[in-house]
Amino acid sequence: MTDKELGIHTEEVQIDGTDSFHCHRYEPTSYEVLEELFYHYTPMENDVIVDYGCGLGRLNFYVENRFSLMSTGVELTDRYYTRALRNRETYLGDKEKITFVQCAAQNYEVSPNETVFYFFNPFSISIFRQVINRILLSWQEHPRVLTLILYYPEDDVVFYIEQHTSFALFGEFASGEEVKCDRRERFCLYRLDI
């Protein structure tokens, strides 16, 4: 799969220096890495995916194209949010299944139908905790099976999930050969049951 096949433009890595301790730089998950993820993990047909720090929306377009899933991309930066909306306009698939929301991740109101939450090292542990707390609050109000997908996770994020939440690890695998040089080049998948 490529941007051209989808009618979108997501090939960009943030190099402007505006990333910070709390919000890490934008970099899309490569199509090869997405293929690896979905080789090991198959979402349910009624899953709704939320991509926190979605940038230009690559994951959202990918899951709609491959699985016909609904998704929401949460993006703080105006520039990326605007370009994600532009990508939605030019996308060759079902635009109606893709939503973008501009807000801070910790302020995003999790909908009762959202079940899978994707994180590509988007922000600091202090913000991550707040996001997870909102997800857990939604789960308490509307019990359902939830899945967290962490790509390129920092140690403090993994520790927090495993020691301070009820999510249980159900899958961990390398995202490619790069894991030999950087152990963060992996996926950690967690589930919270009813």
Where in this protein do the model-derived segments appear?
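Conserved SAM-binding strand-loop segment of SAM-dependent methyltransferases
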Residues: 94-103
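Glycine-rich SAM-binding Motif I of class I
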Residues: 57-61
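Conserved SAM-binding motif I beta-strand of class I
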Residues: 70-75
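S-adenosyl-L-methionine
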Residues: 1-44
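C-terminal substrate-binding/active-site "lid" region of AdoMet-derived donor-dependent transferases
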Residues: 126-188
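A short SAM/SAH-binding and catalytic strip from SAM-dependent methyltransferases
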Residues: 114-127
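Conserved SAM-binding loop
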Residues: 84-85
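Conserved class I S-adenosyl-L-methionine
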Residues: 46-55
